[in-house]
Amino acid sequence: MAKGLLMTYALWAFGGPVGLHHLYLGRDSHALLWMLTLGGGGLGWLWEFWKLPSFVAQANGVQSWKQRPEEERPPLSLLRFASQMVVGVYFGLVALISLSSTANFYIVGLPLAVGLGVLLVAAVGNQTSDFKNTLGAAFLTSPVFYGRPIAILPISLAASITAQKHRRYKVSAVSETLSVRLYRVGLAYLAFTGPLAYSTLYNTAATINYAAETLGSFLSWFNFFPLLGRLVESVLLLPCRIWWLLVGAPGFNSSQFQEWEKLYEFVDSFQDEKRQLAHQVLGIPEGATNEEIHRSYRDLVKVWHPDHNRHQTEEAQRHFLEIQAAYEVLSQPKKPRASWR
């Protein structure tokens, strides 16, 4: 049956963040992705407004793209590659929070979670990728940074590159009933949310503490890249801020939600901690004016520029990078701390 554009827009408006319009159009992988990420943090859902006509046309012309020659490859998409990276990291963080206590987690659980996240994005729309090669790349990369949360990044990168290398169009498949499709999507959704829900509800304090440690370790790798660090912090805090926007009155009553409030405050506190460290690096007191910051930065750069310290190049390079990062942090206007009360 032909799909209607008006119905698609209606489902997008009223159930878009959970992928109702994608279920209607037969894009089950896209629907599952939206369910697990709330429409890509809301940004992907809004961006789709302009893409819905092409989605409907694709759904109505499903036979044409399923009959493409197998040797034809889809064009390379940087957006899809970046999405694979982000979702792979997201799946890895969820696995770290909910499954890290299991045996051989960093060799089996983590690469499996990251690889499945990458494959989910690879299967969006009329494309897919090679299951074995993508997961194989994830498992082969798992020993890099073994035992550390930062291991998520090389695993996700390797899996995303492999998925792009083996990208292809989906082949023709037998049409399935809606109940069968919903059953399969539901099982996948429960497989993702079940361990996380159990860990959260039955061991809330330990889960929050581990989440805080994991996020702290993960964010510490971005100290020398303040702009990227702020972007990562914003992405991590986005679900909390969306919840705050929806409920209207910040603050939680139950003890479990109060624990999550502490996690929000922990991640949000990185902004103040980075500014304090930046003041120490530049040797200026807190509350220093922009002129004082710039003067101290200029003086320190002259002292520690690698070209002026050829006898101690490595130490000079380290100090020079720290000074650059500190100046970049203090050059940005301080954001007001969000209050939950």
Curated annotation (Swiss-Prot):
GO CC annotation: membrane
Transmembrane segments: 5-25, 30-50, 81-101, 105-125, 135-155, 185-205, 232-252
Superkingdom: Eukaryota
TM2 domain mapped to chain residues: 4-50
Keywords: Chaperone, Membrane, Transmembrane, Transmembrane helix
Subcellular compartments: Membrane
Lipid bilayer topology: Multi-pass membrane protein
Gene3D superfamilies named among the record's database cross-references: DnaJ domain
Predominant place of localization: membrane
Domain J: 277-341
Function summary: May function as a co-chaperone.
PANTHER family membership: DNAJ HOMOLOG SUBFAMILY C MEMBER 22 (PTHR44733:SF1)
Protein name: DnaJ homolog subfamily C member 22
Provenance organism: Rattus norvegicus (Rat)
Name of encoding gene: Dnajc22
